[in-house]
UniProtKB/Swiss-Prot annotation:
SUPFAM superfamilies: 2-isopropylmalate synthase LeuA, allosteric (dimerisation) domain (SSF110921), Aldolase (SSF51569), post-HMGL domain-like (SSF89000). Residues 33-307 form the Pyruvate carboxyltransferase domain. This is 2-isopropylmalate synthase. Belongs to the alpha-IPM synthase/homocitrate synthase family. LeuA type 2 subfamily. Catalyzes the condensation of the acetyl group of acetyl-CoA with 3-methyl-2-oxobutanoate (2-ketoisovalerate) to form 3-carboxy-3-hydroxy-4-methylpentanoate (2-isopropylmalate). InterPro entries: 2-isopropylmalate_synth_dimer, AIPM/Hcit_synth_CS, Aldolase_TIM, IPM_Synthase, LeuA-like_post-cat, LeuA_allosteric_dom_sf, LeuA_N_DRE-TIM, PYR_CT. Mg(2+) binds at D42, H246, H248, N282. Homodimer. HAMAP family: LeuA_type2. Keywords: Amino-acid biosynthesis, Branched-chain amino acid biosynthesis, Cytoplasm, Leucine biosynthesis, Magnesium, Metal-binding, Transferase. Its main location: cytoplasm. GO terms for molecular function: 2-isopropylmalate synthase activity; acetyl-CoA C-acetyltransferase activity; magnesium ion binding. It comes from Pseudomonas fluorescens (strain Pf0-1).
């Protein structure tokens, strides 16, 4: 079987929402929502190998540390394991005073009774009721009409009131989800939710949560936003209701649907760290939160050690985070492209402390989430001079002049093409050494002596000539400065086109780096590098580096 030529014979387009006066497109997100993690329930039930109690507790502690204040811990009536985990959290004091445990149940009385029993002794708790309301579930799964579906919700809501009254020492919050909300007729979703509201009788001081799931994402995010805004406008007793979002990622737009849903009037977001969950996953709380952060909004969640959080999630879920996952993937702060690297390097050079972040290609400062800058620029065959220069400067304090960056990038390009792999900063530094600092054929500087005479410099250098049977030569010259004197003493006509120097390090361990662009015998200019504790020695080494590289080129040998 293959894809249909006419998919409309099998699939229907999702109907649009009639909301011509929608206001959400002109709204912005200006504050963090209430966050609820469903990692331990919705996320856990989707794992090939669900977490054991040890992993669950480790995950719980991570969520608390990050700052999630509402955590859906389990479906306690589903198994003894889930029930026992809730008891462990309560009895062993793992629930901070500012954090609320949440549990899920269906509408049967035995399940509800067991759920409330699991929460005995909790200071406060959210009990979450759900039943599916969409036409396909009514017809295919439950064989119920609308009245039957509404009766399930209403009867269960009454049981919530009954069993909560038996444990008056707990501060209860009730939550209801018309599961498959996004595929349910809006009028009917409102009808069911209004009926639940009447049973629970919330007030502005003691609100209930109405959670509106895109259980299966079935339309573009703007449609979900229209549904949320319509519900926000029309639900009864809106001032006593917290509207919660629970999106999935079947169409790849769970984050967008959540953000538009918040613009449409929602107050709360349920999801999982890094988007774990059934099928393609729940909305990724980390991405939504850090999207807010990069817009200047405090998300009230702390991902200062995002790699530490990732480690816990990967080990507990036994699922690796994708290297391109927003904010946390191994490659999301990494540039291989030459033009990208050049822009990033220039951005870092101009970025001042305590100013607005404006480094190109990096929407967030990696340091804010505990990342170093080491992996920002990596070099492969697509890389250019900017990335190579950045790595040498950041890792080794070597600041190549601009024209030398171009020349050395060609050397690196040849090496990456040969290897077929990316090069590390260490490999690039080694290549710089072999290409420039070890360029000692045919002339290797052995020693030099410098004297100042009447404002002029006199230089004598001893050179090992490897092209003439390893004999040592002595060249002498005078000039206005050491380099000019050395050039005057060379038996080969050379012209210094450019010279740069800088210190590497500071204090007693500092060294000098010198860079010379040299034209030999009127040929194409090449660069040389010298590094030494003495700046004069470094400049002489740089000149011999350039001289030898020029004389070693094929065109020089042919001449």
């Amino acid at each position: 079987m293959s894809m249909l030529k006419d998919p409309s014979s099998k699939y229907r387009a999702f109907p649009v929402i009639n909301l011509p006066d929608r206001t959400w497109p002109s709204k912005t997100i200006d504050a963090a929502p209430i966050w609820c993690s469903s990692d331990l329930r919705d996320g856990n039930q989707s794992l090939i190998e669900p977490m054991d109690a040890v992993k669950k507790l480790r995950f719980w502690k991570t969520l608390v540390q990050v700052g999630v204040k509402e955590i859906e811990a389990s479906f306690p009536a589903a198994s003894q394991t889930d029930f026992d985990f809730v008891r462990t959290l309560i009895e062993d004091g793992h629930i901070p005073d500012d954090t609320t445990i949440q549990v899920l149940t269906q509408g049967r009385e035995d399940l509800i009774e067991r759920t409330f029993e699991s929460l005995r002794g909790a200071k406060k708790a959210i009990v979450h009721l759900y039943n599916a309301t969409s036409p396909s579930f009514r017809r295919i799964v439950f064989n119920q009409d609308k009245d039957g579906i509404k009766a399930i919700a209403v009867n269960a809501a009454k049981l919530f009131v009954k069993y909560a009254a038996m444990q008056p020492d707990t501060e209860w919050t009730f939550e209801y989800s018309p599961e498959t909300f996004s595929a349910t007729e809006l009028e009917f979703a409102k009808e069911v939710c209004d009926a639940v509201i009447e049973v629970w009788n919330p007030t502005p001081e003691h609100k209930i949560i109405l959670n509106l799931p895109a259980t299966v994402e079935c339309a573009t995010p703007n449609v979900y936003a229209d549904q949320i805004e319509w519900f926000h406008r029309n639900i009864n007793r809106r001032d006593s209701v917290i509207i919660s979002l629970h999106t999935h990622n079947d169409r790849g737009t769970g984050v967008a649907a959540t953000e538009l849903g918040l613009m449409a009037g929602a107050d709360r977001v349920e999801g999982c760290l890094f988007g774990n969950g059934e099928r393609t996953g729940n909305v990724d709380l980390v991405t939504v939160a850090l999207n807010m952060y990069t817009q200047g909004i405090n998300p009230d969640l702390d991902f200062s050690d995002i790699d530490g959080v990732r480690k816990v999630v990967e080990e507990c879920n036994q699922i690796q985070v994708h290297p391109r996952h927003p904010y946390v993937g191994d490659l999301v702060h990494t540039a291989f492209s030459g033009s990208h690297q050049d822009a990033i390097r220039k951005g870092f050079a101009q970025q001042k402390p305590d100013t607005l972040w404006e480094v190109p290609y990096l929407p967030i400062d990696p340091a804010d989430i505990g990342r170093s800058y080491e992996a920002v620029i990596r070099v492969n065959s697509q890389s250019g001079k900017g990335g190579i220069a950045y790595l040498l400067e950041q890792e080794y304090g070597i600041s190549l002049p601009r024209r030398m960056q171009i020349e050395f990038s060609q050397v690196v390009q040849r090496e990456t093409d040969r290897l077929g792999l990316e090069m590390t900063a260490q490999q690039i530094h080694a290549l710089l050494h072999s290409e420039y600092l070890q360029a000692n054929t045919p002339y290797a500087l052995v020693s030099h002596r410098l004297q100042e005479e009447n404002g002029n410099s006199a230089v004598e250098v001893e050179v090992a000539s490897k092209g003439q049977g390893e004999t040592n030569l002595h060249w002498r010259g005078k000039g206005n400065g050491a380099l000019e004197a050395l050039v005057a003493g060379l038996p080969i006509p050379v012209e210094i086109m450019d010279y740069n120097e800088h210190a590497i390090g500071a204090g007693t361990n500092a060294k000098a780096a010198a860079y010379i662009e040299l034209r030999v015998n009127g040929e194409r200019a090449v660069h040389g590098v010298g590094i030494d504790e003495n700046i004069t020695t470094a400049s002489f080494k740089a000149l011999f580096s350039a001289l030898n590289r020029s004389l070693s080129q094929p065109e020089a040998k042919a001449a």
